[in-house]
Amino acid sequence: MKLLSIPVGVSDFEEIRRNGYYYVDKSGLIGELLGTTGTKVTLITRPRRFGKTLGMSMLESFFDIQKDNKALFEELEIAKRHELCMEWMNQWPTVFVSFRQVDGLNFNSAYDMLTLVISELYKKHLYLLDSDKVDSFDKEIVKQLIQGTASAKDTKGSLMLLTRLMYQQYGKPVILLIDEYDVPVAKANSNGYYEEMLDVMKGLMQALKDNQALCFAVITGCLKIAKESIFTGTNNFISDTITDSRLNEYFGFVQSEVDQILKDADVLDKAESIREWYDGYHFGDFDVYCPWDVMNYLLELQRNPKAKPVSYWKNTSDNAVIRSFIDYAGSNITGKLETLLAGGTIVQRVDENLTYDYLHSSENNLWSMLYLTGYLTKAREEDYNGKLADGTVALMIPNAEIKEIFETTVIKWFDDSTKKCDRSTLFDAVWNGDSGNLTKEMNVLLRRTISYHDYKEDFYHAFLAGIFTGAGYMVDSNKEHGEGRSDVVVYDPINSRVAIFEAKYTKSLDKLESECDAAIQQIDDRMYAKEYEDDYDQILCYGISFFKKRCMVKKKLVKT
């Protein structure tokens, strides 16, 4: 493998270019945006980790009149457009602000973070304090914004003020770049101060409305919050979402780019596994890979050439959206989730104009959220051949990485929900050797589960072990016993008793009883109970057979 300087965690365009980091050329975005005549405000929504912040940093580097970045764009696609570069490269006053760090458990702490962001933004423009084109009243407000002592009114008006002052300073209208505009309201919705933060963000976005100092604005986020909620009164406003085609090649890696990356890194043999794990997003007319994942995996391959693909989304707080969805919808969406986890598609109505406070108001809103945040994607035509009604989309899980996240979440959800339900009748049936009631109680639990492995052995083993986890028992799964492996062993040392479970699964209902008998026979033949005879007063053995969401239990008392 060839060593490349992989910029994982670096979203600053200038840092990447100056330090010689590997860069996939997305400069065509500049020409695409400038080619949209008559558009004052462009909102671009994509899932997290698809290069939005890096793209915005590139725009700032290209337009900002305070910079001289011609060298950084040499050999990039945009440099071929000489007249455009003459007119626009480092010729326009530019404001770039990102709200992705604005978070807090309550409104006051989040508001403090926001005022810090505004303060740091104004520190980039200290020249305004010395300018004879800025009056003393405005200079005083600028000082207060820098110090973090400005009133709420002036904080809300800070972007409007900055564009006006820069217009006065340079005599040119200002380009305004706002990154991750929806993070503050998303965090606010999660922590119970949505209305307060929405009011602040509405104020900040007044810079987009009837602003003579504005040349144009580009805004990025995850969701297209309903215009009437946050962009009230904004004219000449267009949005570009994952259902559109115009800009989709600029966010995420298309196949030709991934092919070139793998060639440059000399890891073409990893193409199939990278496609399986990190491809599969169908945005507009483009199939794209998640760039965050591809770059992380390439970096890992440089450390360990034998490294297998893993989920790089797995340990992020954003994944809570799946859990909240399952918690809300519960058994109502079990069948749909099982279809998705089996590699199938489901058809749902999708609304791109959501507001965070209404995300949980309907099942459709939650499916829309999973789609817009990248946990589901639009199925390709070859993956779904049915006819779709207006406003509906055929959805599927994009790749192995996201499937693993769903599976992990489903397991945790089942474990948690099982712990909350009353299992005393089931436990009594186990220790009383009541296979009839045990069959009944297990069937009830099975109907509440979400299958994530096409009803194969590992699904049933996890189900069986999960029933007893967190209930005060010791649980062993697939431990070596006698001449083989029993599936699950449950220990109750306080009462000196142990229950041994051997599970079988069958593909037909009529074999349920015979497989149950086979499980009992296996316990006998392989002497699973023998090692417990000296240490426990009561040993109960159970054979269980499963068919989809049905089961049968039979018992064998070894020692009572």
Model-derived features with residue positions:
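Structural signature of nuclease core domains in nucleic-acid processing machines
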Residues: 435-560
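Phosphate-binding site recognition
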Residues: 1-456, 471-473
